[in-house]
Curated annotation (Swiss-Prot):
This is Neugrin. Residues 1-15 form the signal peptide. It is found in: Nucleus; Secreted; Mitochondrion membrane. Residues 256-265 have a biased composition (Basic and acidic residues). PANTHER family: NEUGRIN (PTHR13475:SF4). It comes from Pongo abelii. The keyword Phosphoprotein applies. Coiled coil: none annotated. Residues 39-49 have a biased composition (Acidic residues). The keyword Transmembrane helix does not apply. Residues 27-49, 224-270 are annotated as: Disordered. Glycans are attached at N158.
Length: 291
């Protein structure tokens, strides 16, 4: 009788505990100790979500700590600009028209800057005035040692030939190719190359030097009157030995040298000179010189 009463009371207590929600896995479903939890149970997904939230918070704290240390180590304010406004417009144009070909790393490599600078340029929507553009370009070119070039461009009123970056200075400027079609992959990254003014300023000097050399050469080819009295008669030399007998500056050999050559090759010389246009030949038809 006592055993039956105790069993009845224990059963009622277990039922009451189960109704109140305090039943445990061991009481409801007794089993061996150390068994792995059932993946189909109700509390497994909640624990999994809790772990994901904890890992996310940990990553966020780590990122915040890294940004804080970075701000402490770097200089305050925005970094100094190393690109001209023309280069910034090129970056925006290339990234907008050809985003696949000109990604952020590709632009950073092409303009010799960091990816943070490229992202700042793409994110910025600031529209400066002409004075602000010239002031910024002057700072960039002064840092690159090209301030005289900027003064020359400002004097001519042409600011479209400024160099793209202060670090890498080249003889040409890359401009977006408006004629390039985005349909053709071969021309998707076409660029128009404009020569720098530094090459053009050297061209007149080279031509001036060449013209002076030609003028001196023509003056050295004035015919010398021979003792026979003919205006076109002079002492001649063979055309085969013309180049080695000339002096270093392109003038004809001296009279003494001509006498020596005449003594060495007496049969090849003649006292008659025939002019054909600007070319002179001897009586045997051998070419002498050209004026």
């Amino acid at each position: 009788m006592a055993v039956t009463l105790s069993l009845l009371l224990s059963g009622r207590v277990c039922a009451a505990v189960a109704r109140c929600g305090f039943a445990t896995r061991g009481v409801a479903d007794p089993g061996p100790i150390g068994r792995e939890p059932d993946p189909d149970s109700d509390w497994e997904p909640e624990e999994r979500e809790l772990q994901e939230v904890k890992s996310t918070l940990k990553r966020q704290k780590k990122a915040i700590r890294f940004q804080k240390i970075r701000r402490q180590m770097e200089a305050s304010g925005a970094p100094p600009r190393t690109l001209t406004w023309e280069a910034m417009e090129q970056i925006r144009y290339l990234h907008e028209e050809f985003p696949e070909s000109w990604s952020v790393p590709r632009l950073a490599e092409g303009f010799d800057v960091s990816t943070d600078v490229i992202r700042r340029v793409l994110k910025s929507k600031f529209l400066p005035t002409l004075e602000q553009k010239l002031k910024q370009d002057q700072k960039v070119l002064k840092k690159a040692g090209l301030a005289p070039l900027l003064q020359q461009l400002r004097g001519s009123g042409n600011t479209s030939k400024l160099l793209p970056a202060g670090h890498s200075v080249s003889g040409s400027l890359l401009m977006p190719g408006h004629e390039a079609s985005s349909k053709d992959p071969n021309h998707s990254t076409a660029l128009k190359v404009i020569e720098s003014d530094t090459h053009r300023t050297n061209t007149p000097r080279r031509w001036k030097g060449r013209n002076k050399e030609i003028q001196d050469l023509e003056e050295s080819f004035v015919p010398v009157a021979a003792p026979l009295g003919h205006p076109r008669e002079l002492q001649k030399y063979s055309s085969d030995s013309e180049s080695p007998r000339r002096t270093g500056n392109g003038a004809l050999p001296s009279d003494q040298k001509l006498e020596e050559l005449k003594a060495e090759e007496p049969g090849n010389f003649s006292s008659k000179v025939v002019q054909r246009g600007r070319e002179f030949f001897d009586s045997n038809g051998n070419f002498l010189y050209r004026i």
